[in-house]
């Protein structure tokens, strides 16, 4: 390495008139040396620079394509999600309406059932009252009839003879049988 540096230093000490050499002082270099160096850099660096730019361009295009594909996939998923959301909202509305109508239907059924039960209780109450009234009337009639019969028997026994007594008893038994048939 020292030999290469020494050779460049030797070249810089040579007189510039009539010879060709490298001038290491950048401010003192002439335009021709700069153009030669730039020409060499452009000639040899052009391929490297073109490859770098092409690679960068390909990466950018690949990234753009991937981004577009991801965007399209995201848009597709978003549309599917929106469609699912609309479907679920429609089902929720349908269930809500069905639920409300079912609740109203059950409410009406319950009200009708309670009304029917109350009517049955009212009918049972009225039947029970009528039965008890009829029972009380029958008991009063039987008691009145027994008392009347006892009073009549007492009166007959005291005032009638045996033959008249038997005829009166037969007539009363006939009347009692007719009353009993009438009540049943």
UniProtKB/Swiss-Prot annotation:
Note: In plastids the F-type ATPase is also known as CF(1)CF(0).
Keyword field: ATP synthesis, CF(0), Chloroplast, Hydrogen ion transport, Ion transport, Membrane, Plastid, Thylakoid, Transmembrane, Transmembrane helix, Transport
Recorded GO CC terms: chloroplast thylakoid membrane; proton-transporting ATP synthase complex
Keyword Oxidoreductase assigned: no
Signal peptide residue numbers: none
HAMAP family in UniProt: ATP_synth_b_bprime
Topology in membrane: Single-pass membrane protein
Primary role: F(1)F(0) ATP synthase produces ATP from ADP in the presence of a proton or sodium gradient. F-type ATPases consist of two structural domains, F(1) containing the extramembraneous catalytic core and F(0) containing the membrane proton channel, linked together by a central stalk and a peripheral stalk. During catalysis, ATP synthesis in the catalytic domain of F(1) is coupled via a rotary mechanism of the central stalk subunits to proton translocation.
Molecular function, one GO term: proton-transporting ATP synthase activity, rotational mechanism
Oligomer and partners: F-type ATPases have 2 components, F(1) - the catalytic core - and F(0) - the membrane proton channel. F(1) has five subunits: alpha(3), beta(3), gamma(1), delta(1), epsilon(1). F(0) has four main subunits: a(1), b(1), b'(1) and c(10-14). The alpha and beta chains form an alternating ring which encloses part of the gamma chain. F(1) is attached to F(0) by a central stalk formed by the gamma and epsilon chains, while a peripheral stalk is formed by the delta, b and b' chains.
Protein family per UniProt: Belongs to the ATPase B chain family.
Transport is among the record's keywords: yes
CDD domains, sorted: ATP-synt_Fo_b
Name of the protein: ATP synthase subunit b, chloroplastic
Family matches, as PANTHER family: ATP SYNTHASE SUBUNIT B, CHLOROPLASTIC
